[in-house]
Design a protein with these regions (language model features):
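Active-site neighborhoods and metal-handling regions in enzymes and metal-associated proteins
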Residues: 1-347
Length: 347
């Protein structure tokens, strides 16, 4: 896009016969350009010529921070900036413009996310039905992946399904489900349009809670419902997170696992021993929407700044909510042996 000239360009190479043999007939570059409202299309090699000319004229070339290594290498070829440092030269103006554009979802986008959530619902209810003693985690994870695939979709991220939920991103599905354990499933679907869903649910193996499991489950459920109750346009998600943490701390205090003044405990971050992550994040074309652009620009702004406090520092979304935002609500309660041992050693 040449902002100064007010012109859009589409670069790409048309397929040759070898491509057609292996991939079948493909739309032309000109047709692809027309689909997105661009009238001028050129072979990909001309992109380097146009960018090089702009640089030679002293014009600023705007690009987003590259996430994939191949794009880093391409930007090095186009701009002459070494791939190892090219991220430092990403355009802050363009980052903020894209964040502003993608943060507020249109009705058609929300419809796509709803459809992805419907697939996610089917995935999670299947996991609940299969959560029985003697079943291998990998089998259930495979069923979930298959459900997403059956809709022409894919999973929105690598499925997390485990009876060792104390590891937050546990992709080890090698265990056999056992009576008395809880199975955590963190999974979602991604539509062909790339819009995503993301749900986290925990259920008892065999369908019956044991000991304090139901008490802890109900605390997390109350946290989830508290976020739904208070989240609205105009309130910061940082404050929603903090209020949810108070519900968690109060519930754990009632169980004898925390003590003292709840407000003071949450302000000090004591609850992070059990909830060492944030409540939620933006969701859209990526499951952690736009995270590659820099979470400080996506989840925060000049008004709400990220915290360095343990637990709260992992909150990806803290800024003031607006109508059209799509945010996840994912509280949890974890008993992480290494973290508990560290806390005991530092008492």
């Amino acid at each position: 896009m040449d902002v100064e000239a007010g012109e859009d360009y589409f670069f790409g190479n048309d397929v040759d016969m070898d491509d057609i043999i292996w991939m079948g007939p493909q739309p032309s570059v000109k047709d692809l350009a027309a689909q997105v409202g661009v009238q001028q299309s050129f072979p990909f090699a001309q992109l380097k010529e146009i960018v090089g000319k702009a640089i030679a004229q002293g014009r600023k070339v705007h690009f987003l921070p590259p996430y994939r290594y191949d794009n880093m290498m391409l930007l090095e070829e186009l701009t002459g900036i070494r791939a190892s440092i090219v991220k430092k030269y990403a355009s802050l103006e363009l980052i903020k413009a894209v964040v502003a554009l993608r943060s507020v979802k249109e009705a058609c986008e929300i419809e796509e996310i709803d459809l992805a959530c419907n697939i996610g619902y089917e995935m999670h209810t299947a996991a609940m039905r299969l959560c029985k003693p003697g079943v291998k985690e990998q089998y259930i994870a495979g069923v979930l992946d298959g459900i997403a695939s059956s809709y022409g979709s894919m999973t929105s991220f690598a499925t997390i399904l485990t009876q060792h939920g104390e590891t937050l991103h546990n992709h080890d599905h090698s265990h056999i489900l056992e009576v008395g354990r809880m199975m955590l499933t963190d999974a979602g679907a991604e539509r062909l349009s790339n819009y995503c869903s993301d749900h986290t649910r925990t259920v008892p193996v065999g369908g019956k809670f044991q000991g304090r499991q139901k008490d802890v489950y109900n605390i997390v459920l109350a946290c989830h419902d508290k976020a739904l109750e208070i989240a609205r346009p105009g309130i910061t998600y940082m404050s929603v997170h903090q209020e949810v943490c108070k519900v968690l701390a109060q519930g754990l205090k009632d169980l004898g696992l925390m003590k003292g003044n709840i407000d003071e405990a949450v302000a000090a971050g004591a609850h992070a021993l059990f909830l060492p992550h944030g409540l939620g994040h933006m969701m859209g074309l990526d499951v952690h929407d736009m995270e590659d652009l820099g979470q400080i620009y996506v989840g925060y702004d000049d008004e709400v700044r990220p915290s360095s406090q343990f637990g709260l520092a992992s909150l990806r979304m803290g800024r003031r909510l607006q109508e059209g935002f799509v945010i996840t609500d994912e509280p949890g309660c974890y008993f992480i042996p290494a973290l508990i041992d560290k806390w005991r050693a530092e008492k």
